Amino acid sequence: MSMDVTFLGTGAAYPSPTRGASAVVLRCEGECWLFDCGEGTQTQLMKSQLKAGRITKIFITHLHGDHFFGLPGLLCTISLQSGSVVARQPIEIYGPVGLRDFIWRTMELSHTELVFPYVVHELVPTADQCPVEELREFAHMDETDSSPKGQGRTILLDAEENSYCLVDDEQFVVKAFRLFHRIPSFGFSVVEKKRAGKLNAQKLRDLGVPPGPAYGKLKNGISVVLDNGVTISPQDVLKKPMVGRKVCILGDCSGVVGDGGVKLCFEADLLIHEATLDDSQMDKAREHGHSTPQMAAAFAKLCRAKRLVLTHFSQRYKPTALAREGEADGIAELRKQAEAVLELQEVTLAEDFMVIGIPIKK
């Protein structure tokens, strides 16, 4: 099963000609999950090899404009490109409290009717995720008879696990964890479940299992009885299960809240972490709830992440290929700062339209 990550926007604060606003797509067997949707994400999608109509889930890390102002426009474009009638499952949208009302009000005010259903699941933050003066309560928002009620889940922190369970299906488990930022922010851990090992052809022959339907049953975990009365169990003929992959994507932060993030990101195959400013501006980064390469690398080291990708760069840091003379030194320095913490383990600097494959574990 193929799996890859495409960066649509790798810049902080606003989109620019060299870096789009925050947006990352995790693609698995053609299905696409979008993480953050900054302004201009839909045009970035059009420039990429991805199809907006393949998006089935959207995860918003926090409610700063450079991470979700592109969402209403993207939903409208998907609707316009879908024709008049669409038979599809609802697009599942996950994000902090307030996201449901934002989308609903945007559609109401613009008289927009989407041709597909969508459901918004809201994560309830805790008071320690941001400075106390920045914590907002949404109970004051005016409600009308037509306000969205009962649409999607309201997801509370599992205090024991220190995380939020968002998805748990046949293939994946997705959980969110708390980050510290100027407003409540979240990170997401996507874990592929173990898959049954391949059939051992030699053992099948040795045990006299005839090719055909019996192979399929054994592969699916069902025992079969041969004509001679012998029962063959799946564990008799299956190789070891294939360990699933783990991708972790963090929103804006100057640190994690609690131990949920460390536990969920432990030994991640791919860890995507913001690095808005270089280490010389660490105090400024912390003041604004952001990270530097050293901070990101320290978290990756704590989690024993196999690969660290830095993103969400200040627009002053131009991609190497687009930098003018002298500008490339700044972005290269970010890599050096992170690699110094990770003892020269390779660090990747994300660029718009960069694609990173996550190979199946052997």
Curated annotation (Swiss-Prot):
Its main location: cytoplasm. Zn(2+) 1 binds at H62, H64, H181, D252. It catalyses: Endonucleolytic cleavage of RNA, removing extra 3' nucleotides from tRNA precursor, generating 3' termini of tRNAs. A 3'-hydroxy group is left at the tRNA terminus and a 5'-phosphoryl group is left at the trailer molecule. GO terms for molecular function: 3'-tRNA processing endoribonuclease activity; metal ion binding; tRNA-specific ribonuclease activity. It holds the Pfam family Lactamase_B. One of its GO terms (cellular component) is nucleoplasm. It is an enzyme of class 3 (hydrolase). One of its GO terms (biological process) is rescue of stalled ribosome. The keyword Lipid metabolism does not apply. It is found in: Cytoplasm, Cytosol; Nucleus. Keywords: Cytoplasm, Endonuclease, Hydrolase, Metal-binding, Nuclease, Nucleus, tRNA processing, Zinc. SUPFAM superfamilies: Metallo-hydrolase/oxidoreductase. InterPro entries: Metallo-B-lactamas (IPR001279), RibonucZ/Hydroxyglut_hydro (IPR036866), RNase_Z/BN (IPR013471). Zn(2+) 2 binds at D66, H67, D252, H312. Binds 2 Zn(2+) ions. Its cofactor is Zn(2+). Its EC number is 3.1.26.11. The active site is at D66. Homodimer. Belongs to the RNase Z family. Zinc phosphodiesterase, which displays some tRNA 3'-processing endonuclease activity. Specifically involved in tRNA repair: acts downstream of the ribosome-associated quality control (RQC) pathway by removing a 2',3'-cyclic phosphate from tRNAs following cleavage by ANKZF1. tRNAs are then processed by TRNT1. This is Zinc phosphodiesterase ELAC protein 1. The lineage of its organism: Eukaryota, Metazoa, Chordata, Craniata, Vertebrata. The gene is Elac1.
